[in-house]
Amino acid sequence: MNRIKTIPLELRQANEFVDNFHRHHDSVHRDKFRFGAVVDGKLVGVCQVARPVSRHLDDGNTLEVVRLCTNGSKDVCSFCYSKAARIAKELGYSKIITYILNSESGASLKASGWQIEAETKGGSWDRPSRRRTTTAPIVPKVRYSRILRKE
């Protein structure tokens, strides 16, 4: 496999890739930054990073990988997780997080220096006081993190 390179993407381009390839999530409405992973001029993955979805984790120093999606090409997930962490660190953030389904191995995260931080029960953001339609899996998830700098 040739070397993986990054390219800038517009939100529309990233969302189109997610809509075509992501196994269980829809595209996002906004993000802080995003990039594409390219091999031989072909887009093989996208990574989108935003403020943490959970307001309890949104401390101003943490970012979340909200979408990482590939076409199945080898090593692209690890490449994207590593690149997202480097970019977040360069921007001055101290921590980056992401969630995976508890049925996923996390091998790409472990390979790129991330560690398990917590396990969630899963569930939906829907509440009687604030109705939401849930399209994502509501199964338990594992939160991984990578410390980028000591505070």
What would you call each of these model-derived segments?
Residues 8, 32, 50-140:
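Acyl-donor binding region in acyl/amide transferases
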Residues 27-28, 37, 56:
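Short, conserved, surface-exposed binding loops centered on an aromatic residue
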Residues 18, 32-47:
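Conserved beta-hairpin
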Residues 1-28:
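Short amphipathic alpha-helix that is part of the acyltransferase structural core
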Residues 140-151:
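Charged phosphate-binding loop/patch that engages nucleotide di/tri-phosphates or the phosphate backbone
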